[in-house]
Amino acid sequence: MYKSYGERAKSHPSKVASRLLNLMESKQTNLCASVDVTKTQELLELLDKLGPYICLVKTHIDIVEDFSYEHTILPLQGLAKKHNFMIFEDRKFADIGNTVKLQYKGGIYRTSKWADITNAHGVTGAGIVEGLKQAAEESTDEPRGLLMLAELSSKGSLATGEYTQKTVEIAKSDKEFVIGFIAQRDMGGREEGFDWLIMTPGVGLDDKGDSLGQQYRTVDEVMQTGTDVIIVGRGLFGKGRDPEVEGKRYRNAGWEAYKRRIA
């Protein structure tokens, strides 16, 4: 039996996860927009249109060619406030603890200062969690959350089997900072007191894949296997699609699938 987002928010040990779950409940959306565009203006214009329909935006800030903190991040934060969504920088950290600490809080992006959520691979072990947590604590008073990459949506991904299980074990090292997984299904943990959020990429209502190995599953498919947040990218704005029309369509599909799951 699945609990509602609101019920889970009340008892969640993470302030970030609790805030996101409450936002999802009040805004009636479990849609995360993956906005992989290379210009600041396009990023901001898309998010102004998609903002009313999403709980979260997933960025790859290092592909923005005209990036600046003042002209990219500050307006992005303004849109997040205006439309009431949170920010997830899909950085996929994968180095030793000390290095990821420097990467997360420094450089030109200073990700820990503005992204509510980021993510990491488990390949280097549990030190990556501690390094990222230290960076967050040293650079901001705002709560931050980490997703571990347990599974990927691309064809031939190596994140399966024993690797996935060991990533789950790493996630258990910090109940407050690690809020869940990028995964294709429920990762369990409830019997040990964990309430992980599952965010699933590769969700599409129309296409089944692309020429570079991406594989899409439907909203209903992913919700029935334990997903909490559906991550949609090109389905919202690619191939000349209208982001407002598609945003509403995916938001409604995700919410209806969620209601069926908790009924």
Swiss-Prot record:
Q: Which gene encodes it?
A: URA3
Q: Where is the active site?
A: K92 (proton donor)
Q: Name one Pfam family in it.
A: OMPdecase
Residues that bind substrate: 36, 58-60, 90-99, 216, 234
Q: Which NCBIfam families match?
A: pyrF (TIGR01740)
Q: Which organism is it from?
A: Pichia angusta
Keywords for the protein's UniProt record, in alphabetical order: Decarboxylase, Lyase, Pyrimidine biosynthesis
Q: Reaction(s) catalyzed by this protein? A: orotidine 5'-phosphate + H(+) = UMP + CO2
Per its UniProt record, what SMART domains does this chain match? OMPdecase
Instruction: Report the EC code(s) recorded for this entry.
Output: 4.1.1.23
This chain's protein is named Orotidine 5'-phosphate decarboxylase
Q: Which Gene Ontology cellular-component terms appear in the entry?
A: cytosol
